[in-house]
């Protein structure tokens, strides 16, 4: 039995988040997406935690369900469950630098949330302004506060490589978990990859070798949910999962009833900070070019935003281990390490993007939305379609072009121009004039061939 979890989401009470990020709509989209466990998000916000208490009921195991469940004839196989999680932004000075670190907190019960909130308010933190509050506590002090209230809570550094707001961030982060979390470093048993890195990149970091690598969407709208996810698999066929099961699986405890089976990944090149560069100057560098040319923009002479790939290579142990690829019977390309000590992962392109490119349309167009809904209704869920449904069945429902797009995504047969300095990368299933032009520009700039 497996449970697909997206445990980093935001509510409508966070800045730049869709009004549709409410609990019933999130649950409805979870069925479309193929997600079993969702983050509530934002439980530090006074209005949102009140909505959580009004809309959810405890399932007796540290997870919560809607008091009235949404039903979907084909895609609902289990009740959608919610885990109490929140992202907190810590901005503080340490070691002569300003640090900006974002951490996820997982809570096993509402009582713990309320105690943490009360303690934060007592320390002068403003929890009303944003669902993702900004506080002045260091990561170490935040850990002390949380673990003194409930030792079963978890703290997970989120989007761990983002330049501006993360554990390893090139502009305001640290070089190690020990440096960031101090005496609580041993309690940090996992990190979240973020969109600009994947597990393979994180496997190169020595201190992450024995920690879990998690992936979640950080979605600000329902349609973005599940673009990254972590799948928990039962070791003995259990059909029920608890908060403690998730916690022990992440901690990789021997007595855990579940383990991390695999993760679902965004293409890291599509992330906003994969390469080094300056968006306003339209200038980008690969890690090799950055080592050669430095981190000053040749156009404006200001510091470049150092990308995630370069930062990973800076902190990595000597040499990168080789990726191992395996294609399963559904034509899906899986990636793992040579020793197979880490859970495998798969890189996907969202179904609505495949449909949009196939129809020469946009993801926001009504015809793309209609076909997406039709496919999820008739074939089970987005993740089921992307990973398991026979291509022949997709052809019957959506036509050859969409089916071919899904098949190409499963094989990893796509075109990518990496993102940099806050600009998303470009992913195309079929090479077009835009990709060719971008590749020619990049080749000219970097002196490489595509």
Q: What is each of the regions a protein language model found here?
A:
Residues 211-227:
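Short acidic/histidine-rich active-site segments
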Residues 261-334:
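Cys/His-rich short segments
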Residues 4-13, 43, 215-220:
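Histidine-centered catalytic micro-motifs
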Residues 28-48, 154-156:
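Divalent metal-dependent hydrolysis catalytic cores, especially in the metallo-beta-lactamase
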Residues 15-18, 49-53, 165-172, 203, ...:
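Histidine/acidic-residue-rich catalytic or RNA/ligand-binding cores of hydrolases
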Residues 66-78, 234-241, 248-259, 363:
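Short, basic, low-complexity termini and linkers enriched in Ser/Thr/Gly/Pro
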Residues 2, 50-189, 447:
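Extended substrate/RNA-proximal surfaces in nucleic-acid metabolism proteins
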Residues 345, 349-450:
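Low-complexity, acidic/Ser/Thr- and charged residue-rich accessory regions of DNA metabolism proteins
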């Amino acid at each position: 039995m497996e449970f697909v979890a997206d445990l980093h989401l935001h509510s409508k009470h966070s800045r730049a988040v869709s009004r549709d990020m409410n609990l019933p709509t999130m649950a409805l989209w979870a069925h479309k997406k193929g997600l079993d466990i969702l983050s509530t998000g934002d439980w530090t916000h006074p209005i949102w935690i009140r909505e959580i208490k009004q809309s959810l009921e405890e399932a007796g195991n540290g997870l919560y369900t809607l008091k009235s469940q949404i039903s979907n004839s084909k895609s609902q196989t289990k009740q959608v469950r919610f885990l109490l999680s929140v992202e907190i932004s810590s901005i503080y000075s340490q070691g002569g630098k300003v640090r900006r670190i974002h951490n996820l907190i997982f809570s096993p019960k509402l009582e713990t949330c309320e105690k943490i909130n009360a303690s934060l308010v007592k320390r002068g933190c403003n929890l009303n302004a944003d669902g993702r509050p900004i506080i002045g506590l260091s990561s170490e002090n935040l850990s002390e506060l949380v673990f003194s209230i409930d030792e079963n809570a978890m703290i997970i550094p989120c989007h761990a490589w983002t330049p501006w707001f993360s554990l390893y961030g090139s502009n305001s982060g640290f070089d190690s978990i020990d440096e960031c979390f101090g005496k609580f470093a041993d309690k940090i048993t996992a990190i979240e990859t973020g969109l600009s890195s994947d597990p393979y990149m994180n496997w190169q970091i020595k201190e992450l070798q024995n920690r879990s690598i998690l992936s979640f969407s950080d979605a600000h709208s329902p349609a973005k949910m599940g673009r990254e996810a972590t799948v928990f698999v039962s070791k003995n066929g259990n059909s029920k999962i608890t908060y403690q099961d998730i916690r022990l699986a992440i901690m990789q405890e021997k007595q855990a009833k579940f383990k991390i089976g695999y993760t679902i990944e965004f293409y890291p090149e599509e992330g906003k900070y994969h390469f080094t560069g300056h968006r306003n100057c339209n200038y980008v560098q690969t890690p090799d070019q950055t080592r050669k040319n430095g981190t000053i923009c040749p156009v404006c002479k200001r510091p470049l935003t150092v990308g995630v790939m370069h930062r990973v290579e800076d902190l990595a142990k000597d040499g990168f281990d080789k990726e191992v690829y395996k294609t399963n019977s559904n034509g899906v390309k899986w990636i793992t390490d040579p020793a197979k000590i880490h859970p495998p992962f798969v890189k996907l392109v969202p179904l609505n993007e495949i449909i949009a490119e196939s129809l020469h349309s946009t993801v926001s167009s009504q015809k793309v939305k209609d076909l997406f809904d039709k496919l999820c209704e008739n074939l089970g869920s987005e993740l089921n379609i992307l990973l398991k449904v026979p291509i022949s069945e997709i052809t019957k429902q959506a036509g050859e072009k969409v089916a071919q797009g899904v098949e190409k995504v499963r094989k990893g047969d796509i075109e990518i121009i990496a993102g940099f300095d806050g600009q998303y990368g470009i992913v195309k299933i079929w090479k077009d004039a835009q990709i060719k032009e971008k590749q020619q520009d990049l080749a000219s700039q970097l002196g490489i061939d595509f």
